[in-house]
């Protein structure tokens, strides 16, 4: 029975991940966003020249991700709350439905067990993703929605990130994207997690352009200052610094 319960729990987790990312997709579309990519675990569906293609990608700290291309900025603004919280909203809605199904079919052992697991996990997903917090190396949806609602520059940075993601999905390299997207934010602005990501992308663009010395100086600066750089991005910057050092001076104090 324990083994069966474990399998049912894994199935419930997977279903709620799909529901969560589906919520981002549905509420993103309602908000005027266009589909870019949809990932569950390491399976990612992307739009490429009007066709949906399957790719493989694993991102640490996330079970799934739905990325969409944002609408054009109007007076420096775009709708962000529904897109960011759409996953949690869908988890809550589905949890209520599954709880109702449990109440109706509570006499059927395995089905009722799956329904209550789906309801509980749905509520858990809604809380963990909807209540603003930093989860390991990435910020959750609630944290993003809160950051965007407080900072106009962060909102602009969010738009840039989504456009970069859209172009990357289409196979466009960073060095071939608009230079205006990669302006390094001020040290003060870098304290915002969303804006800090643009600084990281600026480093990535310099790396793609093989301007390694400039990239190394910028990465060193960004890693030293008090910033909101997410743990995942910070670790990737460290990896890039190691790479630059290995192909350059190989200074022991750096390595």
Which residues make up each language-model segment?
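Hydrophobic alpha-helical transmembrane segments
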Residues: 1-7, 107-121
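Small-residue-rich helix-interface/hinge motifs
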Residues: 8-72
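Juxtamembrane/interfacial segments flanking transmembrane helices
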Residues: 34-36, 130-155
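Alpha-helical repeat scaffolds
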Residues: 176-186, 212-225, 250-255
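Generic helix N-cap/helix-start motif at coil->alpha-helix transitions
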Residues: 191-200, 229-239
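Residue-level signature for tetratricopeptide repeat
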Residues: 205, 243-247
